[in-house]
Amino acid sequence: MAKVIGIDLGTTNSCVAIMDGAQPRVIENSEGARTTPSIVGFTDSERLVGQPAKRQAVTNPSNTVFAVKRLIGRRVGDAEVEKDKKLVPYSIVNGGNGDAWVEVRGEKYSPSQISAFILQKMKETAEAYLGETVTQAVITVPAYFNDAQRQATKDAGKIAGLEVLRIINEPTAAALAYGLDKKDTKTIAVYDLGGGTFDITILEIDDGLFEVKSTNGDTFLGGEDFDMRIVNYLADEFKKEHGVDLTLDKMALQRLKEAAEKAKIELSSSQQTEINQPFISMDRNTGQPLHMVMKLTRAKLESLVGDLIKKSLKPCEAALKDAGVSKSDIDEVVLVGGMTRMPRVVEEVTKFFGKEPHKGVNPDEVVALGAAIQAGVLQGDVKDVVLLDVTPLSLGIETLGGVFTRLIDRNTTIPTKKSQVFSTAEDNQNAVTIRVFQGEREMAADNKLLGQFNLEDIPPAPRGMPQIEVTFDIDANGIVSVSAKDKGTGKSQNITIQASGGLSDEDIEKMVRDAEANAEADKKRRELVETKNQGESLLHSTRKSIEEHGDKVDPSTVEAIELAMGALEEALKSEDAGKIKGGIQNLTEAAMRLGEAIYKASQAEGGATPDEEGPRSVDDDIVDADFEDLGENKRK
């Protein structure tokens, strides 16, 4: 039975894990790292994912996409998208359906597509380790992701060639990994501050039962924001000193971003770090190069980002209130996400909850490990684990006057189903439009519109008379289906909610085909590179053999080999793998004649020597030796 893999699709880094016997384990990627940068780079000739993409980001900033998770399921015009446009060097554009997409080298990509490229890398990592094809996965999302963002993540899995068996919340996955072997009853808080999102989840764990009591968060708060605070500080200081605005130069901005991330990491273990960026700009008056050499202290960093850390504590208050527990009721605080390595974050969390956080989990890997456990549960490999998650935001419809009428409150355990009867607002109304929203505001317009549909052919009747039953159904992935039924006629209409724009089935199928075509193209490119390497290696070894042994063979053999070498050199200039293979075959055959000639020549040389020295008897090779028989006594 093929393995189901667990994937933590992160804003900054991603990670893949599997169940290895009774325990989950993280799989190293082709570079030997346990996490992979969630970065996709586009060059003239290829698409790079992970570390190779990160390495070329400074020289190719406009065509390198990072932190795309912050755009997934979002619309152009959203405040978060407008903010992101100012922070990233690549283009964020309208996808044509109102969704925020990215444009690279004149081609538009949906965030789901970019995420799919990262998921493909995770899939390939698992396949290389397992030695078999992987088709199913559990993928994690921030607990505070709305329906559109969850649906877009599921679409990304489909584009990557994966059947997504479950979308699981990141803090819940972390709790699974933390509590898998724990038998006692505990109430825990999972504080998850990652690269782009923040979640706080309160859970009760009781001998294999994981029950989420509440969740809260901010899907636009994370390490990327901390990095940008440092970038802005460095750019401001440089402008004060040299009068040059580095934020206008995409390449300089990318260098600053990498320097900021490195400095932030270093300041988690040291009090001061130096940021050294030579030749980062040029003096417009003198034409002389300008260098950035600055010191950054931990205290300065903490002053730059203090409000961001404080911002994470408000959702913690809300989550405790919704769960009906106090800070003193929390038995353990589990820290998740790379940003929780920052000492000031740990201090603030300790102060807030009144206890030292648990440090027994790797914050970068624990979510992927939890996803692997959930995969094991679904596959039947992990027994006695029951997971009860919740929907993070209230769901409802718009009613008369633009009011948001809730059908399912936030923190309701999922899967769940809820129905409510509504009626018409006008006499003889023959159709109703059901507009579905998600959020906590009282007016529908202030919440997130998930989608809408019409129920038509309602028989004419006075207002308030028709009975229209609206049913919300949320599955275990947190994805919403809505139906409306006229109880008088039995006529019904239903939809699985997609983002207001969203990807249609046709869009997804096209992207799946593109991904498959790209996979085939990548395979051909790899085959071409390997064939070229083989050809160059053969040329080198043959050339060396001619230099050393060319005088031992007749000139016609050498000439034939040199002709074959010339033909292969020409073939190597092309991009035709078949032509190169033909050249390799011809040179291999010609080089074999060289080997045969060398072997015959050495045999001839070796065979002439004994005749010149004259015949020898068999005894010539025997050496006489005297020995003394010790006898029995002498042997003892």
Curated annotation (Swiss-Prot):
Q: Does the keyword Nucleotide-binding apply?
A: yes
Q: Which PROSITE patterns match?
A: HSP70_1, HSP70_2, HSP70_3
Which factors induce or repress this protein, as stated in its UniProt record?
By stress conditions e.g. heat shock.
Q: Which SUPFAM superfamilies has this protein been placed in? A: Actin-like ATPase domain, Heat shock protein 70kD (HSP70), C-terminal subdomain, Heat shock protein 70kD (HSP70), peptide-binding domain
- InterPro entries cross-referenced by the UniProt entry: ATPase_NBD, Chaperone_DnaK, Heat_shock_70_CS, HSP70_C_sf, HSP70_peptide-bd_sf, Hsp_70_fam
Tell me the domain of life. Answer: Bacteria
Q: Matching Gene3D superfamilies, A to Z?
A: 1.20.1270.10, 3.30.420.40, Actin, Chain A, domain 4, Substrate Binding Domain Of DNAk, Chain A, domain 1
Task: Point out residues bearing the modification Phosphothreonine.
Answer: 197
UniProt feature, compositional bias: Acidic residues: 620-630
Q: Where is this region: Disordered?
A: 602-636
The Swiss-Prot or TrEMBL record annotates one GO molecular function as: unfolded protein binding
Question: Which UniProt key words apply to this protein?
Answer: ATP-binding, Chaperone, Nucleotide-binding, Phosphoprotein, Stress response
Q: What does this protein do?
A: Acts as a chaperone.
Q: Which family does it belong to?
A: Belongs to the heat shock protein 70 family.
From the Swiss-Prot or TrEMBL record, give the protein name: Chaperone protein DnaK
Which organism's genome codes for this protein?
Cereibacter sphaeroides (strain ATCC 17029 / ATH 2.4.9) (Rhodobacter sphaeroides)
